[in-house]
């Protein structure tokens, strides 16, 4: 351990030393520590063999002596693992170029967390090929117990009873409340979470959920891995954030807006930990070159009529049917006897809603769709969007330059998304289906200039490169994590190998 301590000192104070000398000393210290661990395990194994031999033969002195020579004699680990020739350093390290494991922690409490996780996964492959292996997992669902493994159904129940969710959101906001609550859960499930981390052997952990910071970070700290595993948080709320998003021990906290960054600073995160890049959105939204006329032809839309996109989220929630019927009336010009616009309705998984809309008589062109995986095409083919204030949908609409009409929000985390859109001139808020329909009719008629201005402001507010900026910064963090992290092929071995210098720490 003294060698390791000396190594840390040399890295912290490199003045008067060359980088080459520092690297060599650090590598040597790390290798010595690994050799000590292996010899410790062998000594335990040897003691077990002596005990077994004594019981079997009664008198095993000669045999034991031979075993001692075999176990403690020359070891291949004692050979130099670097060679210095003509001023160069060659590191001979098995697995030095191995792919790093990235574990993205999420939970299906709303569709935004999984969408953000999947959005982050793809750029690792696009930017860095096979350098990273990315796993998207609900760690609490797979490796914890109640209530952590039941968050998805609990969340769905509470958002259907919004006042209940509002109470839960605000009563758990004080730090002492949620820290006590999470510490209590950790006392029951930390070992199971540790087993989950062990399964994936992460070099990098990315949390896209507010409850996926505390327990994994505590596990890393107990195992002495907080300085070896890169841990970052990607916040998926545009404005209003629950305080559990912010943890002072993360390497980075990626904020989607300046307002969120200010909240992070108030929760003791340092400027070096905070980055403002935007909300991570799938590369198919960010970089695809989509022409509206081509998309309308592909999706079998009327090429001449402006189109409004009405969304009810993944579950088809909200006043979708009522708003659709109001749009069916307002977008039909009775004097001319023809439609002035067309309607696309995304019903998500709500098959009842989809069937009821398809059964109605319509005076305007309409497309009724279920759960869609290519929203970039439908958004690209439309001229404006009506949706609840979900952060992912808002960010996608901004990238497509769609003026937004927000018709609902979930109390708590979605409240701040309304002023984020409205104050930046990218949309309006209206809970009245009739007023919403009248507004769309004006945008498609005499107020078309207002629609154009809002489209320009939406594009200005958009951050299409956010997900690539996040992934590149994580890549740089991983490279800067330290010489030990870069050269070791068994970075997370401490999850599995007990150190002779330490004993496991248990949370009581």
UniProtKB/Swiss-Prot annotation:
Residues 1-60 form a transit peptide. Residues 51-79 are annotated as: Disordered. It is an enzyme of class 2 (transferase). Coiled coil: none annotated. Its EC number is 2.4.1.46. It comes from the Eukaryota. GO terms for cellular component: chloroplast membrane. One of its GO terms (molecular function) is 1,2-diacylglycerol 3-beta-galactosyltransferase activity. One of its GO terms (biological process) is glycolipid biosynthetic process. The keyword Magnesium does not apply. The keyword Cytoplasm does not apply. Belongs to the glycosyltransferase 28 family. Involved in the synthesis of the major structural component of photosynthetic membranes. This is Probable monogalactosyldiacylglycerol synthase 3, chloroplastic. It comes from Oryza sativa subsp. japonica (Rice).
């Amino acid at each position: 351990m003294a060698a390791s301590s000396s190594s840390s000192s040399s890295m912290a104070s490199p003045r008067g030393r060359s980088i080459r000398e520092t690297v060599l000393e650090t590598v040597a210290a790390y290798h010595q520590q690994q050799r000590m661990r292996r010899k410790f395990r062998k000594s335990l194994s040897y003691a077990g063999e002596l005990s077994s031999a004594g019981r079997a033969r009664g008198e095993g002195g000669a045999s034991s002596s031979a075993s001692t020579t075999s176990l403690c004699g020359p070891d291949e680990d004692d050979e130099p693992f670097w060679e210095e020739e003509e001023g160069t350093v060659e590191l001979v390290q098995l697995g030095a170029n191995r792919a790093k494991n990235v574990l993205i922690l999420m939970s299906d409490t709303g569709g935004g967390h999984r969408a953000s996780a999947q959005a982050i996964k793809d750029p690792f492959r696009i930017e860095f090929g096979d350098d990273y292996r990315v796993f998207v997992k609900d760690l609490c669902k797979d490796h914890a117990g109640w209530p952590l493994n039941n968050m998805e159904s609990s969340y769905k129940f509470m958002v259907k009873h919004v006042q209940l969710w509002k109470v839960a959101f605000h009563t758990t906001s004080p730090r002492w409340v949620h820290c006590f609550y999470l510490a209590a859960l950790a006392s029951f499930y930390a070992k199971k979470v540790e087993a989950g981390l062990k399964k994936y052997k992460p070099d990098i952990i990315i949390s896209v959920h507010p409850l996926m910071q505390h327990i994994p970070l505590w596990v890393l700290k107990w195992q002495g891995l907080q300085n070896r595993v890169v841990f970052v948080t990607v916040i998926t709320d545009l404005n209003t954030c629950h305080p559990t998003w912010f943890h002072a021990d993360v390497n980075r906290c990626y904020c989607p807006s300046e307002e969120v960054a200010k909240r992070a600073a108030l929760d003791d995160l340092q400027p070096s930990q905070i980055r403002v890049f935007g909300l991570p959105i799938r590369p198919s939204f960010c970089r695809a070159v989509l022409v509206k006329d081509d998309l309308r032809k592909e999706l079998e839309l009327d090429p001449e009529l402006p189109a409004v996109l009405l969304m009810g989220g993944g579950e088809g929630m909200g006043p979708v049917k009522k708003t659709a019927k109001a749009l069916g009336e307002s977008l039909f010009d009775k004097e001319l006897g023809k439609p002035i616009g067309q309607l696309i309705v995304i019903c998500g998984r709500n098959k009842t809603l989809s069937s009821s809309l398809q059964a109605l008589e319509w005076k305007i062109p309409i497309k009724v769709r279920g759960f869609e995986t290519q929203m970039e095409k439908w958004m690209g083919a439309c001229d404006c969007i009506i949706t609840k204030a979900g952060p992912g949908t808002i960010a996608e609409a901004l990238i497509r330059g769609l003026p937004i009409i927000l018709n609902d929000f979930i109390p708590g985390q979605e409240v701040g998304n309304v002023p984020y859109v409205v104050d930046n001139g990218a949309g309006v808020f209206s809970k009245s289906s009739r007023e919403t329909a009248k507004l769309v009719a004006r945008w498609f008629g005499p107020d078309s200039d207002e629609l154009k201005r809002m489209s320009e402001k939406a594009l200005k507010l958009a951050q299409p490169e956010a997900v690539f900026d996040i992934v590149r910064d994580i890549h740089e963090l991983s490279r800067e994590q330290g010489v030990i992290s870069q050269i070791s092929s068994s970075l997370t071995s401490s999850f599995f190998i007990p150190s002779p210098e330490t004993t496991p720490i248990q949370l009581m």
